[in-house]
A protein has these predicted regions:
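Juxta-kinase regulatory segment immediately upstream of eukaryotic protein kinase catalytic domains
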Residues: 1-32
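Active-site acidic catalytic loop and adjacent metal/ATP-binding pocket
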Residues: 39-55, 66, 210-260
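Active-site activation/catalytic loop segments of kinase-like enzymes and analogous catalytic loops
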Residues: 91, 254-295, 311-331
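ATP-dependent phospho-/nucleotidyl transfer catalytic cores
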Residues: 130-228, 239-242, 334, 338, ...
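ATP/Mg2+ or Mg2+-diphosphate-binding catalytic cores
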Residues: 309-359
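Structured soluble/peripheral alpha/beta segments that form catalytic or ligand/cofactor-binding pockets
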Residues: 359-666
């Protein structure tokens, strides 16, 4: 295998006969043809048929090879890069596969650029072969072949100390209890009438104790090993007459180091219909154990107990995978089949008895170090932003500010807007070169200084800008110019609640009281301890790949409500948020929904948030329009509003919608 990092094949068009000749090393390739195969979302596969200059293909000359490259879709590529999927698969074929043999395709070339996500794998073609069918299930003979080959893969690496320390193989899982709970809520909302009562018990017990389950299975006394991570029939190719191998395992992007019996349990839980599994279960466990080899550090009883404990992995995969991939009719049938069979596996082995007690995760809090600026990674859409708002109902004035640093585009965005029911909307919307100092920047038209003067307690903003005034704020969504006017914000945000850190991404929110001065032309406002919010966010942010509704609301009784409902095309919506009482107690929210209507100008007319629920009466509009480098456009209608809860409590706050438009060139 060649690992030429300097020469990554990004697309099939990059292939040449000379390159294929060198990579395969089986003689001069005179010509080749390319055929797309498979429908993967994170990567793309192509069959490359080869014509040799000095003779036909033979035993040492493959007739065809398979090229695997990163997805062309930028969102999919960023996801694959951020999760380490591309690096894992390349490193597996380069570092681990040569030690194993067995059901693994030969690799002729493997390379990855971890700064861009470009990668390639040139693999032996598994054909002629038949892919397994998760819904129909395997025959007993196929299941026996699969567990034997899996045992031969696992055996040489059980307890390997070097692999246990390899950073690329031991990335922390992003999944935890706070993440799986809202995914399960969406799962029940979609499939609830198809879930048997006894299977719902399994799911609810797992979700309620998920963090404890993960900690329990990562304990030092649990033997660790190589995990394919998705060892199921859809990733197994059964060789037919003329194939080089009886079985080929594909899609190693989820390879990791973890509980050794996970793959076996996942396979046994669903590869056979429930009654067939029960009939052949013990024989399949024995076949796997024997395939581990005579020096395996596991007894047959150890294998059975490990499979029992890991039977929940399949339940988790049925819930999570169904909520994160594009919905299809076959997908629905497959996920319901998975859930039924894996839950039966849990019940048949009495695995519920191994779960720890249910627990509610404590809300996360940011550290003082989180208030600092962060070093960017190489992802093109990595950004860091600081946001702060206020709403002064007595004076009819609301405002917000955001500084966004898009490091790898060498650009900074500054937004500062003021609005109210009896005033035009004022907007400073500026793009400038990335500053050397993230805390101070300016041009002839604005000066900005900001700082967390007391980390997690006090944040200060000093802004002077030549803004634009709009009697019709929807003009901002159309990119139109307004009337020039000077404005300033000299404000301090003092923390008025518990700082809240997201679990799913690097971001935190802080409810505040805001004081200071604002000027609009010759008009001065004195802001005295009014409700507000601030947040700080850093990481890969593609605002043009999803829609959302965000809110930060503050009630007169001291309650703070925050929620965001994110809507990604092809996936169910999911939510993050909290309710904080005046006593400092924080309750995390799993469901945040909204009902809103928009005018033809793109501004919200009215809305209801379903987190209390809350009715919203818009007091001022302060929208922005964001255009990506590739022409994609997002409209951000933003409004501050008076709010009323169902039980009559009142307050104020800000609401934001992100609404993506078709790409355009500006």
């Amino acid at each position: 295998m060649h690992a030429d990092i300097a020469h990554v094949i990004e697309r099939p068009a990059d292939l040449t006969a000379e390159w294929l000749t060198a990579a395969i090393g089986a003689g001069p390739v005179a010509d080749f043809s390319v055929e797309r195969i498979g429908t993967g979302q994170m990567s793309e596969c192509y069959r490359i048929r080869l014509d040799y200059a000095d003779g036909a293909a033979g035993p040492d000359r493959p007739e065809s090879v398979v090229l695997k490259v990163a997805a062309t879709d930028p969102v999919s590529r960023q996801t694959g890069l951020a999760l380490g999927l591309y690096e894992r698969e390349v490193r597996f074929y380069g570092d681990i596969a040569p030690r194993l043999g067995g059901p693994i395709a030969p690799c002729y070339h493997a390379a990855v650029d971890t700064s861009t996500g470009a990668f390639d794998l040139l693999l032996g073609d598994a054909g002629p072969a038949v892919v397994g069918d998760e819904i129909a299930g395997a025959t007993a003979e196929q299941a026996h072949l699969c567990v034997v080959q899996l045992g031969r893969l696992h055996g040489p690496l059980l307890g390997d100390t070097a692999l246990a320390e390899a950073p690329w193989l031991n990335r922390d899982s992003p999944l935890n209890q706070a993440m799986i709970a809202p995914l399960y809520a969406g799962f029940v909302d979609r499939y609830g009438d198809q879930i048997a009562p006894e299977h719902r018990v399994v799911c609810e017990r797992l979700v309620a104790s998920f963090d404890g389950f993960l900690a329990q299975e990562a304990a030092p006394d649990r033997i660790q090993g190589l995990m394919h991570g998705d060892y199921r029939l859809d990733n197994l190719l059964f060789g037919t007459a003329g194939a080089d191998r009886p079985l080929t395992v594909v899609d190693w992007q989820t390879v990791s180091w973890g509980p050794a019996l996970t793959d076996l349990s996942y396979f046994l839980g669903c590869a056979l219909p429930t009654q067939d599994r029960r009939e052949h279960y013990d024989a399949l466990l024995r076949a796997y154990h024997q395939a581990l080899g005579p020096s395996a550090p596991l007894s047959l009883a150890d294998v059975a107990e490990g499979v029992r404990r890991q039977s929940f992995f399949g339940v988790m995969m049925a819930i999570v995978s169904s909520m994160l991939v594009e919905r299809t009719e076959r997908g629905d049938r497959m996920f319901m089949t998975m859930l039924q069979r894996h839950c039966d596996h849990v019940l048949d082995t009495d695995a519920l008895a191994t779960l720890p007690a249910a627990q509610t995760p404590e809300p996360l809090r940011p550290s003082e170090a989180d208030e600092l600026a962060h070093a960017p990674t190489a992802e093109p859409l990595w950004s860091e932003s600081w946001y702060a708002d206020f709403a002064d109902a007595a004076q009819g004035l609301g405002g917000w500010f955001r500084l966004g640093l898009i490091a790898n585009e060498r650009t900074a965005w500054v937004h500062a807007l003021l609005c109210g029911p009896d005033m035009p909307t004022l907007a400073a919307d500026v793009r400038v070169p990335l500053p050397a100092d993230p805390w101070v920047l300016g041009t002839d038209s604005f000066e900005l200084g900001h700082a967390a003067t007391a980390p997690l307690q006090t944040y200060r903003l000093d802004l002077r800008a030549r803004a634009q005034a709009y009697s019709d704020p929807s003009a901002l969504l159309r990119g139109e110019a307004g009337t020039p006017v000077e404005m300033t914000m000299n404000l301090v945000w003092d923390t008025d609640g518990v700082p809240y850190k997201y679990r799913m991404t690097t971001r935190y929110e802080i409810p505040c009281r805001v004081s200071g001065t604002v000027t609009v032309g010759d008009v001065d406002y004195r802001v005295e301890s009014v409700p507000g919010q601030r947040d700080h966010s850093w990481g890969v942010r593609d605002w043009w790949s999803m829609d959302w509704i965000w809110s930060a609301l503050h009630l007169d009784d001291g309650t703070h409500l925050h929620g965001v409902n994110i809507r990604i095309p092809g996936a169910p919506a999911f939510s993050i948020g909290y309710a904080q009482g005046a006593d400092g107690g924080v309750t995390e929210l799993q469901t945040v929904d909204s009902r809103e209507s928009f005018g033809v100008n793109g501004l919200p007319l009215n809305a209801t948030l379903v987190l209390e629920p809350v009715d919203i009466d818009v007091c001022g509009h302060a929208p922005v329009r964001l255009t990506a480098a590739d022409g994609r456009v997002s409209q951000f209608p933003r409004a501050w509003a008076a709010i009323t809860t169902a039980d009559g409590r009142r307050g104020v706050g800000w609401v934001e919608w992100n609404r993506n438009l078709p790409a355009e060139t500006e």
